[in-house]
Protein backbone atom coordinates (compact mmCIF):
# COMPACT_ATOMS: atom_id res chain seq x y z
CA UNK A 1 0.00 0.00 0.00
CA UNK A 2 1.31 3.45 -0.90
CA UNK A 3 1.23 6.59 1.19
CA UNK A 4 -2.04 7.94 2.58
CA UNK A 5 -3.31 10.49 0.04
CA UNK A 6 -4.44 13.71 1.76
CA UNK A 7 -6.36 16.79 0.62
CA UNK A 8 -5.72 19.85 2.82
CA UNK A 9 -8.50 22.48 2.91
CA UNK A 10 -8.13 25.85 4.64
CA UNK A 11 -8.87 29.36 3.45
CA UNK A 12 -5.69 30.78 5.00
CA UNK A 13 -2.59 29.95 2.99
CA UNK A 14 -0.34 30.17 6.06
CA UNK A 15 -2.40 27.47 7.78
CA UNK A 16 -2.37 25.28 4.68
CA UNK A 17 1.42 25.62 4.49
CA UNK A 18 1.75 24.72 8.18
CA UNK A 19 -0.48 21.67 7.81
CA UNK A 20 1.39 20.51 4.70
CA UNK A 21 4.72 21.01 6.49
CA UNK A 22 3.64 18.89 9.47
CA UNK A 23 2.29 16.13 7.22
CA UNK A 24 5.47 16.16 5.11
CA UNK A 25 7.40 14.93 8.15
CA UNK A 26 5.77 11.51 7.78
CA UNK A 27 6.86 9.48 4.73
CA UNK A 28 3.65 7.41 4.92
CA UNK A 29 1.57 10.52 4.22
CA UNK A 30 1.29 12.51 0.98
CA UNK A 31 -0.56 15.77 0.38
CA UNK A 32 -2.04 15.36 -3.10
CA UNK A 33 -3.79 18.73 -3.34
CA UNK A 34 -4.75 21.86 -1.43
CA UNK A 35 -8.03 23.77 -1.57
CA UNK A 36 -9.03 27.15 -0.16
CA UNK A 37 -12.83 26.93 0.01
CA UNK A 38 -15.61 24.42 0.49
CA UNK A 39 -16.72 24.29 -3.14
CA UNK A 40 -13.19 23.51 -4.34
CA UNK A 41 -12.86 20.87 -1.59
CA UNK A 42 -15.93 19.01 -2.84
CA UNK A 43 -14.75 19.24 -6.47
CA UNK A 44 -11.26 17.96 -5.59
CA UNK A 45 -12.70 15.10 -3.55
CA UNK A 46 -14.92 14.05 -6.43
CA UNK A 47 -11.96 14.18 -8.82
CA UNK A 48 -9.13 12.82 -6.65
CA UNK A 49 -10.90 10.52 -4.15
CA UNK A 50 -8.37 11.21 -1.35
CA UNK A 51 -7.94 8.80 1.54
CA UNK A 52 -8.22 11.67 4.02
CA UNK A 53 -9.43 15.28 3.95
CA UNK A 54 -8.06 17.71 6.55
CA UNK A 55 -10.92 20.21 6.50
CA UNK A 56 -11.26 23.61 8.16
CA UNK A 57 -14.69 24.37 9.63
CA UNK A 58 -14.80 28.06 8.67
CA UNK A 59 -14.51 28.17 4.90
CA UNK A 60 -15.80 30.64 2.29
CA UNK A 61 -18.36 29.70 -0.38
CA UNK A 62 -19.40 26.53 1.47
CA UNK A 63 -18.83 25.89 5.18
CA UNK A 64 -16.63 23.01 6.23
CA UNK A 65 -19.63 21.21 7.72
CA UNK A 66 -21.65 21.53 4.52
CA UNK A 67 -18.61 20.59 2.41
CA UNK A 68 -18.23 17.46 4.57
CA UNK A 69 -21.87 16.50 3.93
CA UNK A 70 -21.25 16.76 0.18
CA UNK A 71 -17.87 14.99 0.37
CA UNK A 72 -19.61 12.03 2.07
CA UNK A 73 -21.69 11.74 -1.14
CA UNK A 74 -19.05 12.31 -3.85
CA UNK A 75 -16.18 10.52 -2.11
CA UNK A 76 -17.73 8.19 0.48
CA UNK A 77 -14.47 6.37 1.29
CA UNK A 78 -12.61 9.58 2.15
CA UNK A 79 -12.13 10.08 5.86
CA UNK A 80 -12.61 13.62 7.16
CA UNK A 81 -10.56 15.24 9.91
CA UNK A 82 -11.80 18.67 10.97
CA UNK A 83 -9.31 21.34 11.94
CA UNK A 84 -10.82 24.44 13.48
CA UNK A 85 -10.06 27.59 15.39
CA UNK A 86 -13.46 27.01 17.06
CA UNK A 87 -13.13 24.85 20.21
CA UNK A 88 -16.87 24.20 20.40
CA UNK A 89 -18.52 20.99 21.57
CA UNK A 90 -21.58 21.83 19.46
CA UNK A 91 -19.56 22.14 16.23
CA UNK A 92 -17.53 19.06 17.16
CA UNK A 93 -20.68 17.00 17.75
CA UNK A 94 -22.11 18.14 14.42
CA UNK A 95 -18.85 17.20 12.67
CA UNK A 96 -18.94 13.73 14.24
CA UNK A 97 -22.62 13.33 13.35
CA UNK A 98 -21.72 14.00 9.71
CA UNK A 99 -19.15 11.22 9.95
CA UNK A 100 -15.87 12.96 10.72
CA UNK A 101 -13.00 10.79 11.92
CA UNK A 102 -11.81 13.53 14.25
CA UNK A 103 -11.86 17.15 15.31
CA UNK A 104 -8.79 19.08 16.40
CA UNK A 105 -8.28 22.72 17.20
CA UNK A 106 -5.74 24.84 15.38
CA UNK A 107 -4.32 25.72 18.79
CA UNK A 108 -3.42 22.04 19.23
CA UNK A 109 -2.49 21.29 15.62
CA UNK A 110 1.25 21.09 16.16
CA UNK A 111 0.76 18.43 18.83
CA UNK A 112 -2.38 16.71 17.53
CA UNK A 113 -2.33 16.73 13.73
CA UNK A 114 -0.17 13.66 13.05
CA UNK A 115 -1.74 11.54 15.82
CA UNK A 116 -5.19 12.56 14.53
CA UNK A 117 -4.27 11.64 10.94
CA UNK A 118 -2.91 8.26 12.08
CA UNK A 119 -6.06 7.63 14.14
CA UNK A 120 -8.32 8.49 11.19
CA UNK A 121 -6.40 6.16 8.89
CA UNK A 122 -6.78 3.39 11.49
CA UNK A 123 -10.56 4.05 11.76
CA UNK A 124 -10.23 5.52 15.25
CA UNK A 125 -11.75 8.80 16.40
CA UNK A 126 -9.47 11.61 17.61
CA UNK A 127 -10.56 14.75 19.48
CA UNK A 128 -8.47 17.66 20.79
CA UNK A 129 -8.31 18.00 24.54
CA UNK A 130 -9.13 21.71 24.50
CA UNK A 131 -12.69 21.52 23.22
CA UNK A 132 -14.59 23.90 25.47
CA UNK A 133 -17.69 22.79 27.35
CA UNK A 134 -20.99 24.24 26.22
CA UNK A 135 -22.34 27.16 28.24
CA UNK A 136 -24.68 25.99 30.98
CA UNK A 137 -28.21 27.23 30.35
CA UNK A 138 -29.26 26.42 33.91
CA UNK A 139 -26.84 28.86 35.55
CA UNK A 140 -28.56 31.56 37.59
CA UNK A 141 -28.77 34.94 35.90
CA UNK A 142 -27.22 37.91 37.65
Feature locations, PLM:
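The feature encodes the CheY-like receiver
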Residues: 15, 60, 84, 88
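Conserved acidic segment of CheY-like receiver
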Residues: 2-15, 19-23
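Conserved phosphotransfer cores of two-component systems
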Residues: 46-48, 70-78, 98
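Active-site beta3 strand of CheY-like receiver
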Residues: 48-54, 59
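Short hydrophobic/Thr-rich beta-strand motif most characteristic of the beta2 strand and flanking loop
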Residues: 28-36, 44
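Acidic catalytic/metal-coordinating carboxylates
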Residues: 37-40, 63-66
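Short, flexible helix-to-coil linker/hinge segments that flank and couple to helix-turn-helix
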Residues: 90-97, 102-142
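Active-site residues of response regulator receiver
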Residues: 10, 56, 84
Amino acid sequence: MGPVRILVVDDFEAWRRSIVSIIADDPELQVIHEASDGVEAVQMCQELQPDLVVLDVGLPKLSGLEAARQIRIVSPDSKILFLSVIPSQYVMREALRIGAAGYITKEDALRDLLPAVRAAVADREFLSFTILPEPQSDLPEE
